[in-house]
Amino acid sequence: MAPQLLLCLILTFLWSLPEAESNVFLKSKVANRFLQRTKRSNSLFEEIRPGNIERECIEEKCSKEEAREVFEDNEKTETFWNVYVDGDQCSSNPCHYRGTCKDGIGSYTCTCLPNYEGKNCEKVLFKSCRAFNGNCWHFCKRVQSETQCSCAESYLLGVDGHSCVAEGDFSCGRNIKARNKREASLPDFVQSQKATVLKKSDNPSPDIRIVNGMDCKLGECPWQAVLINEKGEVFCGGTILSPIHVLTAAHCINQTKSVSVIVGEIDISRKETRRLLSVDKIYVHKKFVPPNSYYQNIDRFAYDYDIAIIRMKTPIQFSENVVPACLPTADFAKEVLMKQDSGIVSGFGRTQSIGYTSNILKVITVPYVDRHTCMLSSNFRITQNMFCAGYDTLPQDACQGDSGGPHITAYGDTHFVTGIISWGEGCARKGKYGVYTKVSNFIPWIKKIMSLK
């Protein structure tokens, strides 16, 4: 009986096995879905290791919280996370004028230096004319706490309040033909060095110099005027200021009995083509001190106030080859123009110290020389109405016959008269500079004379 009972129990157990298996084990499809995961959990060893950004966020994709655990600093976490999510928005250096860029998610923020604003710090807040000339193309003045721009005669202020728009084709200071050529054709600026003290000269030369200049092509020096004496000879230069006014040096006027003017010429040997313009009146500054005069020996100095204006009988006809230079304001000339590297001088004077005058108009660029160096270089008094320009070692200068001619300084595309060729000690001598009448000191006088009927 016992063996039969044991057999029944074994059969019953074997019959129940398939049902038990189906209750304990899931089907493979369901089991795979249940066990699927995207990231394994850190092992106990990993959890106790110090945070490592490469392990947490480079080898695997991490969350912001995991990054924070690594840096343990909110600011560092934000900086990392902004780049981690969508790249560095500051990599292209979008902030202008040395602004500081801070990356964000899908954006960036620029922190601007004082006087700058805008998303990219691209807008300059010009609250002073001393900062970039107040962003003015021509003249700047301070009105209350802001800057106000204005333009030279024959220009209109642009709608942006900064630019200057020429009213006509022949507005002052426009060098149409040379605009894209001047930089390539003129010598590079040469830094002046300390002047060499030379043996004392007996007298300053009343007419200074264009030595080793370049030919000025037709229309590239359109403000150049030439003064002709009663013999038909060139004896001085001048600067066209208006249809009826030519600026020149006072010492030129007492060199001849009569004066005629030529404009628009670059080759004065062709007498058959040149047209002499008649002079109506000449205004010489009443304080001008001629050389070897009574006043020179008392309390004034030779060639001080060396300025004169010629009034024409008939208006000068402007063209591409004949354009007046712009007259600056006194502040603009002193604070902006005369702080440029260099100016431009031109003329038909001697090409060597003892050479002949040139039939071809010559032009050179001459660097401004600081006043202290200027005074050390000369054996003669440099007054407040004078300034120096030129090279102390490079043999380039103006020379006899150039006197009265233009010293021009460009600002942007506009050319302003800044000086009058006045005097020098020889021509292109080592350690010596050309001396020019400082036009900025005479703006009121010039305007007064030009306003006379």
Swiss-Prot record:
Q: Which Pfam families match?
A: EGF, Gla, Trypsin
- Residues annotated as domain EGF-like: 86-122, 129-164
| Active-site residues, Swiss-Prot/TrEMBL | H251, D306, S403
Q: Main localisation, per the record?
A: secreted
Task: List, alphabetically, the InterPro entries matched.
Answer: Coagulation_fac-like_Gla_dom, EGF-like_Ca-bd_dom, EGF-like_dom, EGF-type_Asp/Asn_hydroxyl_site, EGF_Ca-bd_CS, GLA-like_dom_SF, GLA_domain, Pept_S1A_FX
* UniProt superkingdom: Eukaryota
Kindly list the biological process annotations in GO that this record carries: blood coagulation; induction of blood coagulation in another organism; proteolysis; venom-mediated blood coagulation
Ordered alphabetically, the record's keywords are: Blood coagulation cascade activating toxin, Calcium, Cleavage on pair of basic residues, Disulfide bond, EGF-like domain, Gamma-carboxyglutamic acid, Glycoprotein, Hemostasis impairing toxin, Hydrolase, Protease, Prothrombin activator, Repeat, Secreted, Serine protease, Signal, Toxin
Report domain Peptidase S1 positions: 210-451
User: What are the boundaries of the signal sequence?
Assistant: 1-20
Q: In which tissues is it expressed?
A: Expressed by the venom gland.
> Which residues carry the post-translational modification 4-carboxyglutamate, per the record?
E46, E47, E54, E56, E59, E60, E65, E66, E69, E72, E75
Q: Which GO terms describe its cellular component?
A: extracellular region; extracellular space
Q: What is its EC number?
A: 3.4.21.6
What subcellular compartments does it reside in?
A: Secreted
User: Disulfide connectivity?
Assistant: C57-C62, C90-C101, C95-C110, C112-C121, C129-C140, C136-C149, C151-C164, C172-C326, C216-C221, C236-C252, C374-C388, C399-C427
**Record: glycosylation sites:** S92, N254
Q: Where is the Gla domain?
A: 41-86
In terms of SUPFAM superfamilies, this protein maps to:
GLA-domain, Trypsin-like serine proteases
In this entry the propeptide is located at 21-40, 182-209
Q: From the UniProt record, list the reaction(s) this protein catalyses.
A: Selective cleavage of Arg-|-Thr and then Arg-|-Ile bonds in prothrombin to form thrombin
Describe the task this protein carries out: Snake prothrombin activator that attacks the hemostatic system of prey. This protein is functionally similar to blood coagulation factor Xa.
- Give the record's subunit note: Heterodimer of a light chain and a heavy chain; disulfide-linked.
Regarding protein family, the annotation reads:
Belongs to the peptidase S1 family. Snake venom subfamily.
Q: Under what name is this protein listed?
A: Venom prothrombin activator notecarin-D2
What is the protein's species of origin?
Answer: Notechis scutatus scutatus (Mainland tiger snake)
Lineage at the top is:
Eukaryota, Metazoa, Chordata, Craniata, Vertebrata
